Amino acid sequence: MKLKTALTTAALAVSIAAVSAPAMARDTINIVGSSTVYPFATVVAERFGRNTDFPTPKLESTGSGGGLKLFCEGVGTQYPDITNSSRRMKKSEFDNCQSNGVESITEVRI
């Protein structure tokens, strides 16, 4: 379990490193997505906040589809920085991201 937590924390750190410059204007990372992944993501976010110089990310449980929809709406401080999903992104969701300027998408499987 400790290895899994360490890997997840590392994955979150990598995701944070990839956050766009406009999102860095905000002092908190915003994460939306899967209600299934939410309890696990909450623990990871809290540990990240305790063990780094960054504030604990703000999490919102929206469901996988809802999170991907919000994430793909655009780039900037008014949009989520990261989305969690209990499934792979659909091609239609990927295409929606691309058409809204969300071009740098990295999947991290846990």
List PLM regions with ranges.
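Bacterial N-terminal signal peptides that target proteins for export
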Residues: 1-10
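Bacterial N-terminal signal peptides
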Residues: 9-18
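Sec/Tat signal peptide C-region and signal peptidase I cleavage site
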Residues: 19-25
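Short intrinsically disordered, low-complexity coil segments enriched in acidic
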Residues: 1, 19, 106-110
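N-terminal segment of the mature folded domain
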Residues: 25-110
